[in-house]
Amino acid sequence: MGLADLLIYCGKKYGSAEGNQFVDQIFEAMAVTAYEASIELAKEKGSFPFLIGKNDQETQALRKKFIDTGYMKKMPAHIREGVLRFGIRNSHLLTVAPTGSTGTMTGVSTGLEPYYSFSYFRSGRLGKFIEINAEIVDEYLMDHPERTKAELPAWFISAMELTPEEHVGVQCTIQRWVDSSISKTVNAPKGYTVSQVAKVYRDLYEGGAKGGTVYVDGSRDSQVLTLEAVENELTAQVEPLPVVQVNEPVASGEICPICHEGTIEEIGGCSTCTNCKIQLKCGL
């Protein structure tokens, strides 16, 4: 977390060519350092078992195949040579979590994301909206009293001000140096069509991303993040579910005592109705 803050402190715009070049250098350093450490651990404690064969010849073949994969081909020569000679301690080393709650708690940008806005509302667990103000804006204005919130530099850019293509560019730049999947949302404006969303996924795939999430603004009835503190209201009448007492255990294959339509089957370790999906008993 804190990537957007770092770019702002360095005066580089999130999603720009200059910003992506800077991000690429950061994640390259992280990846190389992580793999160097894992090779050192392999020297001390032994290699990841899947890179150890029944004999030296098979071991070398496994390691050669590993360093010839797409990700490892991007690694510096000394990393590839180290893996070939000593193996590597870890099967995977890098990933990026969303850190939505922890980033907000510590007052920095979350995960790899830009700020959703520099002032917004976040839906809490109790359904109430909490106002979030980015501390980095106040810090900047304290150092530059001649400016106002309406006169921030161009590198103070929020998620909805970026194009989906710029979001994709950042994710694919980072994915180049991350050997597992990463959490990143491509924000799209209201009215984004199905074909446009499909193109975003194609761009992610062709750019080497292992996964992707596209969120079209306003596509859900309620949102976790919003620029307005509009409480979610229930418009439908909610009726309490009937309480049914089951005194005798129900065996697999018997009629469901709740809906009287489905049968009880063992699904995922639980006695579950095939019709109403109620779980009467779980082995766990």
Protein language model features and the residues they cover:
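Acidic, proline-/serine-/threonine-rich low-complexity intrinsically disordered repeat tracts
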Residues: 236-248
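Short metal-coordination and nucleic-acid-contact micro-motifs, chiefly zinc-binding Cys/His arrays
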Residues: 250-252, 269
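Cys/His-rich microdomains that often coordinate metals
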Residues: 260-264, 280
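Cysteine-rich micro-motifs
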Residues: 269-280
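Short, cysteine/histidine-rich loop/knuckle motifs that typically chelate Zn2+
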Residues: 256-261, 275
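Core structural elements
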Residues: 1-11, 169
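Internal maturation/activation junctions in enzymes
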Residues: 12-99
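Catalytic alpha/beta core of large soluble enzyme barrels
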Residues: 65, 69-73, 82-89, 94-234
